C-alpha cells in the first residue's frame, strides 16, 4: 500500500510504501468504539463526589408538624426529596471506571483507525518534522503553509525544540508512536506520520 508523502507546503510530492497490516486493515467500527470508550474510561480520575442524606449538613428537627398543615409529611430537610437535600445514589470517589482491553484487541483497533484515516485521506507521511528554535510561531507558520488547522503529528523523535514549540498550539498534538492513543487519532482532522515512525507503528500494531 502507498500513502502520500507531503512536502513543506502540504502538497503530495511523491508516494511511499507502508505496511498493509497497519494502514490497510478492515474497518471495525464496534472495536474502535470499544477501545475509545475504554481509553476514556481508564483516563478518568475518579475524584467526583456527592453527598447522601447522612453527609448533608441539615438540622434533624422536623420542619413542620405531622398533621394539619396540608403538606406532605416530612421528617428532616436532608431528605433527597427536598431542595438542598442529599442524593439518593451519590457519586463516590471509590467508584471504579476501569475497562480492560486485551493487547490483541487494542492493536487491531489502532490499526483499524489508522487504516480508516488513510482511506479518508486524513493521514499522510512527511520526511520529518523539526524546528531549529523552540518558537511556537515557527511551527505555527509551518502548519499554516501546509494548510493544517487541526493536526496530530506522530514523530519518531520529539526533541525539546519541537515539544516546546508545539505545546502552546491549541489544535496541534505532537507525540512519539508509543504515546499515540485512539481518542486523539479520531479527534484531529489530519494525522501526519514521519517516515521514521512508520516502522515503529508497524512493530506496535501489526
UniProtKB/Swiss-Prot annotation:
Superkingdom? Bacteria
The similarity annotation says: Belongs to the universal ribosomal protein uL4 family.
Protein name, please? Answer: Large ribosomal subunit protein uL4
- Record's Gene3D superfamilies? 3.40.1370.10
Please give the residue ranges the record annotates as the region Disordered: 46-77
Q: What is this protein's function per UniProt?
A: One of the primary rRNA binding proteins, this protein initially binds near the 5'-end of the 23S rRNA. It is important during the early stages of 50S assembly. It makes multiple contacts with different domains of the 23S rRNA in the assembled 50S subunit and ribosome. Forms part of the polypeptide exit tunnel.
Cellular component per GO?
ribonucleoprotein complex; ribosome
Q: Which GO terms describe its biological process?
A: translation
Q: Which organism encodes this protein?
A: Paracidovorax citrulli (strain AAC00-1)
One molecular function GO term is: rRNA binding
Q: What keywords were assigned to this record? A: Ribonucleoprotein, Ribosomal protein, RNA-binding, rRNA-binding
Q: How does it associate, per the subunit comment?
A: Part of the 50S ribosomal subunit.
